[in-house]
Design a protein with these regions (language model features):
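Surface-exposed coil loops of outer-membrane beta-barrel proteins
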Residues: 1-38, 124
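Secondary-structure transition into beta-strands, especially the periplasmic turns and strand N-termini
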Residues: 4-9, 82, 86, 119, ...
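Extracellular loop and loop/strand-boundary signature of outer-membrane beta-barrel proteins
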Residues: 21-27, 94-96, 128-131, 165-167
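Detector for outer-membrane/organellar transmembrane beta-barrel domains
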Residues: 37, 41-131, 143
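C-terminal regions of proteins
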Residues: 129, 134, 138-140, 145, ...
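Outer-membrane beta-barrel "beta-signal"
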Residues: 171-172
Length: 172
């Protein structure tokens, strides 16, 4: 919800144990929640998807049945589009706990839009540090091309090159 023409806030709470396949059985693992609060700035409401800076804080409760400790974190992100054609984006996040995939993560990237077709091509690099000290950091690069066939139909092939594997133990 916008609180003025440039500042917006979003918040939410979800079942931390919820899955799309659990037939709407809410809180089966108990009242364990994922909560978030998000505040952002954009030059105008019309530009909110193309030019913005935002911060999000989150917390997930301990999930006793699964043996997962509570965790929390914060993310700062921004994207900016020039001439309706080139978008640069950046995101940095920090968290505490063993539940997140990464406790530290940074991403930089860019997207180019072909004005005559609405196709997009993008490239991003990410570096992340998993919460387990026995796992290595990961640096990866992703490239994609979104072929926009019509307003409601797009196909987006992508390729990812991971330079290290966080699920592989560090070789000593």
């Amino acid at each position: 919800a916008f609180i003025n023409d440039q500042i917006y806030v979003i918040g939410g709470i979800n079942d931390a144990n919820g899955l799309g396949s659990d037939d709407l059985e809410f809180f089966e693992g108990g009242a364990e929640f994922y909560k978030f609060a998000h505040i952002g700035w954009t030059p105008s409401k019309d530009e909110r998807y193309f030019r913005n800076v935002h911060v999000m804080a989150w917390h997930v409760d301990e999930r006793e049945d699964l043996g997962i400790d509570s965790a929390h974190g914060v993310t700062l992100a921004a994207n900016w589009t020039w001439n309706d054609q080139i978008m640069a984006f950046a995101r940095i996040g920090f968290s505490k706990g063993s539940a997140p995939i990464y406790n530290e993560s940074a991403t930089l990237g860019a997207i180019y839009k072909f004005l005559y077709r609405s196709d997009l091509v993008g490239l991003a690099v990410n570096h992340g540090s998993p919460p387990d000290d026995d796992l290595s950091d990961q640096t990866s690069v992703e490239a994609f091309w979104r072929f926009q066939f019509s307003q409601g139909l797009a196909i987006t092939p992508s390729t990812i090159c991971a330079f290290t594997c966080p699920i592989c133990p560090i070789r000593r």
